[in-house]
Design a protein with these regions (language model features):
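Short beta-strand scaffold segments in enzyme catalytic cores
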Residues: 91-96
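Divalent metal-binding pocket/active-site signature
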Residues: 85
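Nucleotide/phosphate-binding catalytic cleft detector across ATP-hydrolyzing
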Residues: 1-82, 99-215
Length: 215
């Protein structure tokens, strides 16, 4: 992505404001182009003011996508307790309190990572690919099926475990699933989760609006 791409986007669409969030190093020319062409521009980092409280002890180490998805969920369901499950390279579990804001979360290996590690860290288990919408049996009848079922169903059971733990504490909450591998999770959970593929983008837009209006 280059400054020329920025110029082209601004020429094609009526863009007025912009926000950038990335884990990779961003070209200074891209930042300069966005800053020059935008009425309001934010290079999102841990110092950016947020519309919800962030109670994480080390905000500088918190993934920008995680806090953005938390803001996105709070935007869609204000004044609610929220569990956000983001299934990508890793699976993250984040909790937003209706009263206290973002309280933290956990990080676990993603579906693809689990499949790969089973192959790489053992001598005989094969590399297995699983379609996102594939229905896996409860118990596999061959090794490939056992790996697929163990990983995909295990991910679903993991999510259910978090949901059950919150419910057992008497916490009413709304659960969101997001991320590129969310369909794997949704297949295992079936009910009780709201699928929102654009949760991070919704959160980034809210953060941009919040800062535009004098956070």
């Amino acid at each position: 992505f280059t400054s020329a791409d920025v110029e082209r986007l601004f020429s094609l669409y009526p863009i007025k404001n912009s926000i950038v969030s990335t884990v990779a190093n961003i070209d200074a020319a891209v930042v300069n182009a966005l800053n020059r062409l935008s009425q309001h521009f934010i290079l999102f980092d841990y110092l950016t003011p947020l519309p919800i409280a962030n109670c994480y002890e080390t905000p500088e180490t918190l993934g920008q996508d995680r806090i953005a998805s938390a803001v996105g969920a709070a935007t869609l369901c204000p004044d609610k307790n929220l569990l956000i499950v983001d299934a990508g390279s890793a699976i993250t579990y984040d909790f937003v309190s209706a009263e206290q804001g973002y309280l933290g979360g956990n990080i676990a290996p993603g579906i693809k990572m689990r499949l790969t590690v089973l192959h790489q860290m053992t001598k005989k288990l094969p590399q297995v690919e699983v379609e996102q919408n594939a229905l896996t049996p409860l118990f596999g009848k061959n090794t490939k099926e056992a790996i697929a079922a163990g990983v995909v169903r295990g991910g679903g059971f993991e999510v259910k475990g978090y949901m059950r733990a919150l419910s057992e504490q008497g916490i009413d909450f709304v659960a969101f699933a997001t991320g590129g591998h969310a369909p794997y999770i949704l297949n295992g959970v079936k009910d009780g989760m709201r699928h929102e593929p654009n949760l991070v983008l919704i959160g980034l837009n809210k953060i941009l609006e919040y800062n535009m209006h004098g956070a």
